[in-house]
Regions:
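Amphipathic alpha-helical transducer elements in NTP-driven molecular machines
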Residues: 32, 46-49, 62-68, 82-96, ...
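C-terminal-of-GTPase-core extension/linker across diverse P-loop GTPases
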Residues: 2-6, 17, 144-354, 361, ...
């Protein structure tokens, strides 16, 4: 899973990225300090891994990972190449979903490119640049499809959808709010094939003031403005304090727990962000366990056993025989796989088995 962190300059993008990856991406107080995207691999928090590691005395523990990309800031006119617009847009095209950092904090030492803090305006600015780029992209596809439809009448369905979609975008609306998207097979296919930037799923990371941050300040007017936009387009909002997260990132586990407790928080904003992104894309993890390694594997919800096996190695999918599956909680409660077998809790599942989150699996295959 690859997530792009986007936002206008000086909204806290690189500060958030620093906290996520502890990679120390430069976070200077001027536009375009992150000219090339910084990439960081981040573990998906999973409290099941350590108990499994202890149970098997595993030599290695490997969590599922999320790839975060810190993408250079953009300004008005990015779709026409202003600032670093062209680079920005091409980098967004490569990600699975967008974490849009929106400035909701005051700091007179950090200059906002528009001269004031207005999250609704900032969201509109970035969405508009994505929409304008999509319109240009769509016009070329529509022209090609119209020509092809003269010989293949089946493509008239695509032409109709593309024309309506173009009109929708020209009203300043994102592709993800287009009627039928996520519900109609033809609409989903056409939008998917069009590779539209404004169709990507979004989490608005509302970057709040450090002072008095609770992670759930529902009365904050700027947060309300972000929430209203998210509600209108079916997006998600996560209040976060990037500066606070950057401070926490340098702490050891005990310090971190104590610090969060003092703030009245159960987990860091980064852990919440990663989990929300995971859920947003409809992903889950299954687990493999043995003396050599305990590992979490990322798959889409609804994945069947052979395709899940293919995540480990293509041979596993090609030569799939069966999956030996046990529920994680049952395995931990009984204390060993042998005890679980005695209780009849290890199931033998075939090619049609739909994997469940937290399945502990041993795949049998032959090639």
């Amino acid at each position: 899973m690859k997530l792009g962190i986007v936002g206008l300059p000086n909204v806290g993008k690189s500060t958030l990225f620093n906290a996520i990856t502890q990679a120390g991406a430069e976070s200077a107080n001027y536009p375009f300090c992150t000219i090339d995207p910084n990439v960081g691999m981040v573990a998906v928090p999973d409290e099941r891994l350590q108990p499994l590691t202890d149970l098997y005395h595993a030599k290695k523990t490997t969590p599922a990972v999320v790839e975060f990309v810190d993408i250079a800031g953009l300004v008005r006119g990015a779709s026409k190449g202003e600032g670093l617009g062209n680079k920005f847009l091409s980098h967004i095209r490569e990600v699975d979903a967008i974490v849009h950092v929106v400035r909701c904090f005051d700091n007179e030492n950090i200059v906002h490119v528009e001269g004031s803090v207005d999250p609704a305006r900032d969201i509109e600015t970035i969405n508009l640049e994505l929409i304008l780029a999509d319109i240009e992209h769509l016009e070329r596809r529509l022209e090609r499809t119209r020509k092809a439809a003269k010989a293949d009448k089946k493509l008239l369905v695509d032409v109709d959808i593309l024309e309506k979609l173009k009109a929708h975008l020209e009203e300043g609306k994102t592709a993800r709010t287009f009627e039928g998207f996520g519900e109609d097979e033809d609409v989903d296919r056409v939008i998917g094939e069009s590779d539209l930037l404004s169709a990507k799923k979004v989490i608005y990371a509302a970057n709040m003031d450090e002072e008095g941050f609770t992670g759930n300040d529902t009365e904050n007017e700027r947060l309300k403005a972000v929430q209203a936009i998210a509600d209108a387009e079916g997006a998600m909002v996560l209040p976060i304090c990037a500066k606070l997260e950057e401070d926490i990132a340098g702490m050891d586990a005990d310090e971190k727990e104590m610090f969060l407790s003092e703030l009245g928080l159960h987990e860091s904003g980064l852990d919440r962000l990663i989990k929300v992104c995971y859920d947003l894309l409809g992903l889950m993890s299954y687990l493999t366990a043995g003396e050599q390694e305990v590992r979490a594997w990322t798959i889409a919800k609804g994945t069947k056993a052979p395709q899940a096996a293919g995540k480990i190695h293509t041979d596993f999918e090609r030569g799939f025989i069966r999956a030996e599956v046990i529920n994680y909680k049952d395995l931990i409660e009984l204390g060993s796989l042998a005890a679980a077998r005695e209780k009849g809790l290890v199931r033998s599942e075939g090619k049609e088995y739909v994997m469940q989150d937290g399945d502990v699996v041993l795949f049998r295959f032959n090639v």
